[in-house]
C-alpha cells in the first residue's frame, strides 16, 4: 500500500493540473458542417473557444455563462456570418467587441441582462443585416448605439422595457431597414414628434410591429403621409374606446398591409364593436388582416365587412361570424381569406372582382353552396369537412378562369361532371377527401392544362383504365393510399407524356403491368413504397429513360432476377430498397453481389437486411458471403439433412416438454381440489367483454365461480407457458374458450387451445366449454382445422346481446360450470347475503 505522504505528493499535482483545465480546452463543440458551422450550446463555457477554425461562418454559443464581451472577442473568426449569443448571461459589452467581423450578417443577443453597453459596442459590423436584442432590458432606442449600422435590415427589440416610441435620428441613416419589432414593450403613447424621422425620410419598405404594447393614445395625424409596408397592432387595447381612438389616430397612413386583432392566448378586449374600425376609411390600405376577435353579433359581422368594402385584400382569421349566410355584394375585393372561423353554413358569395378565395379550416361547415365568382382564379376550400353533391363544373362556381382548386381534407365529393368550363385549371387537390364515382368515367377529360393532381387517400378504387384520359400536360400525380382492381397496376397513364413525378405508395399493389409506364419518357421520380411487391420486375421500368429516383421501400421484395437487372434505367441516381424481405440464399447470388456493387446507387444500403433463411434474419445483406455458395452438393445435402433432423428433434422435445409438464401436473394436482372453477382462454382484443360480462356475472353471481385470468392470477417473473400450465390448467376444473375472430388470428390463443386439448386427454375430470363470441366466417374458421371439426362435433355456447339471449346464455354456462363442482351451501348463502348487503348499501 502507498504511504500517505507519497499518495498526497501524487494527488496534489494531478489536482492542480486538472483545475487548470477549462471545458473549452476539451474541444466540446459539435461540428455541424466541417470548418463552417459549429454548435457550442449549453456547454458551460466561460470564454470564447480558441480551438474552432478561423474559417467558421456560423457559431452558436447560446446558453453559456460568458458574462461579458471584451474588445476583439471574436477576432479569431474573420469569416463569421451568423453568431448566436442567446442567454449567455452577458451583462457588459465593451468597445470593439465585434471588431473584425466584417462579414457578420446576423447577431442574436436574446435573453442577456445587459447593464453596460459601450458606445462602440457594435463597431466593425459593416455587413450586419439582422440584429436580435429581445429581452435584454433595453429601456430606450436612443441609448442603443447602432446608428452606424447602415446595412441593417431587421431590428428586433421585442420584450424589453422601452416606454417611448420616439425613433432616434440615426434611423435616417438606415435606408435598408425593413423590419422593426417593438412588440411587448411598455409603449403607451405615440406622438407626431415620435415619428419625425419617418416624416423626413420615408422608409417605404418598413414593417412595424407594435403588438402587446399597452397603447392608450395616438396623436391625430401622427401617421399622416407616412408610408409603411406593414403595421401590426395585436393585443394592444384594453377597451373598444381606446381601440377606436387609436385607429382614428392612424388617419392619413398609407400601408400595404395592416394587421389588427389579438393573439389566441393574449385577449384584452372583453367585447368588440365594429364601430372601432370605421376609422379605417381614413387610411390607405391594400391588404387588411383581422385575427382572434369575438363576442359580437351577426349584424356586427355585416358591419365589419362593410367597413372593409374599399380594401382589395381581406384576411379574417379565427373570428366568430355566426349566422352570416349572405355576404354583401358589389365589393371590390380581389383577394379574400377566411381561415379557422366559426360560421354557420357556407355563405352565398357574389363578388364579381374576386380573383383569389381562401376558405379553410372553418367550423360548422356541412355542404357547399353555389357561388358566383366570375373572375375567380384561385380557390382553396380545404379542411372544412364540406360535402359536394356535384363536382365540378362552371355551373358550380360560375367562373371559367379558375386555375387553382384545392378541395382537400373535406368530406364526400361526388364527381358528377368532367370539369366542363374549367379547362384552365392547372392545380387540383382532392387529398384526404372521399371521392365518389371518380373511376366511373374519364372525369379529368377536359383538363388539358392541368399540371398538378393529388387524389391521395380519397378511397378511390381504380377499375376504369381511362380514369386519367385527357391529362396531356400533367407533371405531378399523387395517388397514394388508394387501391386497384386485383391489386394490379394496369396501363392507366397513357397520355401523360409530360409526367415527371408519380406517387403510387400505399396502394396494396402486388403486380405491375409490363406496359404500365411505357408512355412516361419524362418521369423522374417514382414512389412505389409501402406496397406488397414480391419481386421487382424491372421490365416495366425500362422505358423510363429520365427516371432518377425510385422508391420501393417497405414492400415484400425477395430479390431481383439476374435478367431483370439488365433492364435498369441508366439514368437512375437513387434506389430505395429498405424494409424489404430479402432472401440471402445462393439462388439470388447475382442479386446479392449486385447490391454490393451498387452501394452508391442504393439508399441506406447498410440498412438492407436479410429476412430468409431464418439463421440470417436481421443480418446485413452486405454481409452475405458468396463463398458459401461454392460448397459441394454433398456437404450442402448433409447440412440440410442435419438441420432438418435437429429441427424435428427440437420440435419433438418442445412438444414433449409441455406433455411432461401437463403429465407431472396431473399427477401432482390430480387428487387435490382445484383452486379455480375455470381457466379462461381469450384474445386480449376481447378483454373488455371478459372483464365486464364474464367475470362480473360469474364471480359476482350466485353461486359465485372463481375464474383464473392471466392478467390477475399469473405469477410475475414466471414464463408465460409455465403460468398457463401450472396456474391455468393444473389448478382449474374446467377451461372456458372464448372463440372470436381475434382468437383465431392469435398464435397465443391457439397455443393455449392446443394445450387445453392435451390437458383434457390427460385429466379425466377436465372439460372444455366453448363460447362463440361473434358470428364467424367459415372460411376464417377453417384455418384452424381441429377447432373447426371440434365445434361441428360438440355443443357450444353462443353469445347473444339481448335480454332473452343473455338469460339463456348465463343459465347454460352456470349449469356447465356446476358440473363436478363441490357443493357448499354455506358459501352460496354467504354470497347471496353479501350481494343483498351491497345492494342495500348502494341504495
Swiss-Prot record:
Residues 832-843 have a biased composition (Basic and acidic residues). It is found in: Cell membrane; Early endosome; Cell projection, Ruffle. GO terms for cellular component: early endosome; lipopolysaccharide receptor complex; plasma membrane; ruffle. Gene3D superfamilies: Ribonuclease Inhibitor, Toll/interleukin-1 receptor homology (TIR) domain. The chain crosses the membrane at residues 634-654. It comes from the Eukaryota. Pfam families: LRR_4, LRR_8, TIR. Residues 1-23 form the signal peptide. Residues 24-54 form the LRRNT domain. Its main location: membrane. Residues 824-843 are annotated as: Disordered. Belongs to the Toll-like receptor family. This is Toll-like receptor 4. It comes from Equus caballus (Horse). The gene is TLR4.
